[in-house]
Amino acid sequence: AEEEVTEESAPAVTMDDSNCAAPENYCVGLVTDLGKVDDKSFNQAAFEGAQIAAGEIGAFLKYVESTDPKDYTANIGQFVAKEYDTIVTVGFLMAEASAAAAAENPNINFVGVDQFQGETLPNLTGLIFAEDQAGYAAGYLAGLMTKTNKVGAVLGTDTVPPVLYFGEGYRNGVMAANPEAEVTVVYHEPANAFTDPEWGAAEAKKQVTQGADIVFGAGGGTGNGALIEIAKSPESGTSVFCIGVDIDQYNT
């Protein structure tokens, strides 16, 4: 009979951050600028990407959810103190804190999501995206689909460049597809711009009441509020539609 060959299992590795400095360990930390990692939008997309990458290389992954911009440096510092190998900071608002931490810790790799790097640092990679093009595609679709020639968008604050790019791209896409369409784009005030689903829902409802049959929602929990308001409408999927952002929000 053919001999069965089995491989000896490798010694179990403790998956925690008690010894990130050891060569055999790899630790990844993630810090959000606002909101939670299960926000069904921007943060979740980043966190799921980090989970996949950590799983592929056998790394330990831990996250911190920021609730106040004043905490950015301290939250990053939690991972620096334990000598994490890579720290991912999520959101435009963390750009300054990320660059400062990277400059002070040249042996740690930093990844800044939605962060343009004005100064090149060898250990800091800024991930930026063509939000205007994505917004344009969403707007073009809305312009083609609308039956009322009225479409809307409910967004986070326009003081955050990626959000503004989404909005302007959306507006231009609508007009390219349907020059007769009326486009209403509203932005939340800077305070709580991404964590106000009630405002998002109210604005989406207002736009539909005014005749919009397509609403684009982008801006964390605020945009989600708009999408949920449209999704729960009796006309949803037949005469009223919404367009999500960042991840496949049909599923989330």
Residue locations for each model-derived region?
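A residue-level marker of the well-folded mature domains of exported/periplasmic proteins
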Residues: 1-252
